[in-house]
Amino acid sequence: MALDLTAYFDRINYRGATDPTLDVLQDLVTVHSRTIPFENLDPLLGVPVDDLSPQALADKLVLRRRGGYCFEHNGLMGYVLAELGYRVRRFAARVVWKLAPDAPLPPQTHTLLGVTFPGSGGCYLVDVGFGGQTPTSPLRLETGAVQPTTHEPYRLEDRVDGFVLQAMVRDTWQTLYEFTTQTRPQIDLKVASWYASTHPASKFVTGLTAAVITDDARWNLSGRDLAVHRAGGTEKIRLADAAAVVDTLSERFGINVADIGERGALETRIDELLARQPGADAP
């Protein structure tokens, strides 16, 4: 069954052109990132993310108006772009952002897209699923050049066995992840997503995270801590309790929390997390 592009365009409020060009690619990345939130509520509640078919992803992110994590966002975007005539390859990445230099090598639990189209002159990277630091523009697969986006600049650097993606965060180049351009079959991504959504030590199982992007800000939620990052600085807000967290997920991040089931069960699970979060006794 083909993906329902009309439903997807309605979900992201897109009314523009659909021919496979760089302008259309930029527009889709922009509106997708501003409309469909990043969230990990399914893994948090013990629901594996192991069906990455176009039907399953469209059902959750489009029809049920939920968000998702990288395998869902980039999975859906890849299907959409392929339907529009782009050539899409799926890559795997190893997230190293905020890791200590001597930390153990992490598994490849991230995915991104390599996209080409008539006249592209090369490959563009598309990643609408990196949560709080999602690139808001397609990036040329070209090392060394600083590439502006609708938010902060990014750049790619060579590594012996591939590339690293870096972002300018607080006036410092920070490495987000390492990747190669080896095309990954769907089964590899399914296994990685199952691991990320079920392993007891996975951050998606042990903690709550959500993110959404606006024209001038990045809104990131980690547990009860809400951060609003703008060019002029960061505003930090500590939410009072689980009820406030659920309200924020619904009202600020646009997540259809009613789709998840009993609100009480979600609040109970979040309460468990907040009790373990540093500074849990502080309002």
Swiss-Prot record:
The active site is at C70 (acyl-thioester intermediate), H110 (proton acceptor), D127. It catalyses: an arylamine + acetyl-CoA = an N-acetylarylamine + CoA. GO terms for biological process: response to antibiotic. Keywords: Acyltransferase, Antibiotic resistance, Transferase. GO terms for cellular component: plasma membrane. Its EC number is 2.3.1.5. Disulfide bonds: none annotated. Was identified as a high-confidence drug target. This is Arylamine N-acetyltransferase. It comes from Mycobacterium tuberculosis (strain ATCC 25618 / H37Rv).
